[in-house]
Curated annotation (Swiss-Prot):
GO BP, sorted A to Z: translation
Record-annotated membrane-spanning stretches: none
GO molecular function: rRNA binding; structural constituent of ribosome; tRNA binding
Function: Located at the top of the head of the 30S subunit, it contacts several helices of the 16S rRNA. In the 70S ribosome it contacts the 23S rRNA (bridge B1a) and protein L5 of the 50S subunit (bridge B1b), connecting the 2 subunits; these bridges are implicated in subunit movement. Contacts the tRNAs in the A and P-sites.
Keyword rRNA-binding: yes
Protein's gene: rpsM
Top-level taxon of origin: Bacteria
Disordered: annotated span: 95-121
Name the UniProt record assigns to this protein: Small ribosomal subunit protein uS13
Amino acid sequence: MARIAGVDIPNDKRVVISLTYVYGIGLATSKKILAAAGVSEDIRVKDLTSDQEDAIRREVDTIKVEGDLRREVNLNIKRLMEIGSYRGIRHRRGLPVRGQNTKNNARTRKGKAVAIAGKKK
């Protein structure tokens, strides 16, 4: 397994797919990285030469991925919560942030439904 940005990428898959195992690299970014590194998208990871691996690593190092990206996203959310914006309040309360309705659904964000005790007979 080749190690790129601290992540072991699978050997048996094509390079363009294997790169998407790194947090912050999707299919489009993966294709851009390979084009800049001059590596074919169809080659398998196990068939890469060490020079090609190094070229891919250099290109990945120019992009914010893994820990740095996660930290930036968390700091952005924390900043929204500190300034008290609407989005920050929704994050703090654990509700949907992007305008979805919460009357019926939103179970993923709100968590498991808590039963309210009904009237006893």
